[in-house]
Regions:
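Hydrophobic, mid-to-C-terminal alpha-helical segments
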Residues: 111-117, 127, 178-191
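Metal-dependent phosphate/diphosphate-handling catalytic cores characterized by acidic Asp/Glu clusters
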Residues: 1-98, 104-114, 135-175
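Short hydrophobic alpha-helical runs that function as membrane-insertion/retention elements
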Residues: 129-132
């Protein structure tokens, strides 16, 4: 059996970027990377904001994305995100993605520098920016529902004392704890 070939990036010009589309080429996670000009209208794409590491220090790439029959080692922190897309039937929905660790050749210092200069444009032109906070925990749904609840009561015309009493009620302890867990995830402190 032949050793898989590592993916080799084609160079991009300073006014270009790569976008990624997941495709079905068999059992492994596969994709295509295509270069587009920033001077022309871009196809509709989503951008992903996420953390590169889980513990803050070590970049781990223990799985490969197949691109043009070549293997691209990909950050472990992306695998759960891709698995969620797949479980929701959204992995192969013909959507373009901009995911920095894949769309930028991380081995090319000059390209990284050029692409970093375009990040504001890349994120602002995305149809959606998805913030991947990490895998779902046992209290993630509680935290997200509590955020919606806080938004709702913030719009009501409560006097501050009544609002304080509502939010300090014992029934909210678990919800505050869940929200604290959500807000202590690495994504919030990565910059």
């Amino acid at each position: 059996m032949a050793t898989p070939t590592l993916y080799s990036y084609e160079p991009v010009k300073p006014h270009q970027l790569r976008l990624l589309k997941f495709v079905d080429y068999g059992t492994s996670v596969s994709a295509i990377l295509k270069t587009f000009s920033l001077r022309q209208p871009l196809p509709t794409y989503d951008s992903l904001s996420y953390t590169w590491t889980t513990n803050g220090d070590v970049l781990s790439k223990s799985w490969n994305l197949v691109i043009d029959k070549q293997q691209l080692p990909v950050l472990d922190t992306l695998r759960p995100f891709i698995d969620v897309l797949e479980s929701k039937g959204q992995l192969l929905d013909d959507r373009w993605w901009w995911i920095d660790s894949i769309c930028i050749n991380q081995s090319d210092v000059e390209e990284k520098s050029q692409q970093i200069q375009h990040m504001q444009h890349i994120y602002s032109q995305a149809s959606r920016v998805i913030c991947w906070l990490g895998e779902e925990s046992s209290d993630s749904n509680i935290a997200m529902e509590f955020v919606k609840h806080l938004d709702k009561i913030s719009r009501d015309k409560y006097h501050i004392d009544k609002l304080r009493a509502i939010l300090q009620a014992g029934e909210y302890r678990a919800k505050w704890a869940a929200l604290g867990n959500l807000l202590s995830r690495r994504w919030w402190s990565r910059i």
